[in-house]
Curated annotation (Swiss-Prot):
Keywords: Amino-acid biosynthesis, Aminotransferase, Cytoplasm, Pyridoxal phosphate, Pyridoxine biosynthesis, Serine biosynthesis, Transferase. This is Phosphoserine aminotransferase. The gene is serC. One of its GO terms (molecular function) is O-phospho-L-serine:2-oxoglutarate aminotransferase activity. It comes from the Bacteria.
Length: 360
């Protein structure tokens, strides 16, 4: 039975990427060594790192003045590293979910040590993060404005580039490469690579170099973006295998036609699942329709059918649907529609939903 992987992360990977990665595990770039054991200082991996950074820029049409880093530590480390490098007096945030909450928490911890302020402009916590706040103004007297573009747990997404003179910092862990973005509007974009780029273990940072070096506090080398830029992401041993797989994924994106093609594919997948939810007699969505994520579709049973949730979870699993259980803070179900998920998988899930509904 074919399995359909809707897991929220680590993400589904394309079969061609997996086959290439499997081959490299036995013989990487003709070295006779596994990519899992090759030295990161070898010229073969140096070429991988360089190509990965350059292709990242190419896919997003990154202008001059930006650098791409592949680091360890995940987005969770960036929650502290970003304010450590950028926050001088004040940073502004909007709180749209768990990961934004964590970013705010770590920024506040940083200010407790080094001074500065954290201002939360708006929050959707009052309705369990089921919408994106819109009634706020981005101040111009802050060092930067931070937001999380896609909220995997709650299924909301900010699919626009804010137009402001204030420096923009975005956590794009779960929707990077899912749509075109105007990189010139951002000063720093970061995220874990395990949603839309590769396996867990790598973290990407896209940073405008002229925003760095402006804080007067001492920075540990491992948390200093300028050190990592100077060392081409190899100040310490990088996540070799995740970077290799990320490169193969980005090559596949390029072969498909780039980010605009990926966006069309993602919109088509999202339309399928949301149409099924909206037309259902037993399922309903959990967030404001205008704020729906094209990466993570969250839904629950309508109140009168709540007792069927466990039955549907078992039924869907028996039909090959993997990873559709919703986060414990929301409940219900979540279908993650990351770039590598084929539309056939979404069609299969919709068929399963309709089959189950017909029984009840």
């Amino acid at each position: 039975m074919k399995k359909h992987n809707f897991t929220a992360g680590p993400c589904i990977l394309n079969d061609l990427v997996l086959k290439d990665a499997a081959s490299a595990c036995l013989n990487f770039a003709g070295t006779g060594l596994s990519v899992l054991e090759v030295s990161h200082r070898d010229k073969e991996f140096d070429a991988v790192m360089l190509e990965a950074r350059n292709l990242f820029k190419e896919l997003l049409d990154v202008p001059e003045g930006y650098e791409v880093l592949f680091l360890g530590g995940g987005a969770s480390l960036q929650f502290y590293q970003v304010p450590l490098n950028l926050l001088k007096k004040k940073a502004a945030f909007i709180n749209t979910g768990t990961w934004a909450t964590n970013a705010i928490k770590q920024a506040k911890i940083m200010t407790q040590v080094y001074g500065g302020e954290v201002e939360v402009l708006a929050s959707s916590e009052d309705k369990n993060f089921s919408y994106i706040p819109k009634d706020f103004v981005i101040p111009e007297d802050v060092d930067y404005f931070h937001f999380t573009t896609n909220n995997t747990i709650y299924g909301t997404e900010i699919r626009k580039d804010f137009d402001t003179k204030t420096r923009l910092v975005a956590d794009m862990s779960s929707d990077i490469f899912s749509r075109p973005i105007d990189v010139s509007k951002y000063d720093l974009i970061y995220g874990g690579a395990q949603k839309n780029i590769g396996p867990a273990g790598a973290t990407f940072v896209l940073v405008k170099t002229d925003v760095l070096g402006q804080v007067d506090r001492p920075l540990p080398d491992m948390l200093n973006y300028q050190i990592h830029i100077k060392k081409d992401s190899m100040f310490n041993t990088p996540p070799v295998f995740p970077v290799y797989v990320a490169l193969q994924t980005m090559k596949w994106y390029k072969e498909l036609g780039g980010v605009k093609v990926l966006e069309k594919m993602n919109l088509d997948k999202a339309a399928l699942i949301y149409d099924a939810i909206d037309s259902s007699k037993i399922f309903r969505g959990t967030v404001n329709p205008e704020d729906r994520s094209i990466m993570n579709a969250c839904f629950v049973m309508k109140d009168e059918y709540k007792e069927l949730e466990k039955e549907f979870a078992t039924f869907a699993a028996s039909r090959g649907m993997v990873g559709i259980k919703g986060h414990r803070s929301v409940g219900g179900f979540r279908a993650s529609l990351y770039n590598a998920l084929p539309i056939e998988s979404v069609q299969s899930l919709v068929s399963v939903m309709k089959e189950f509904e017909a029984k009840h």
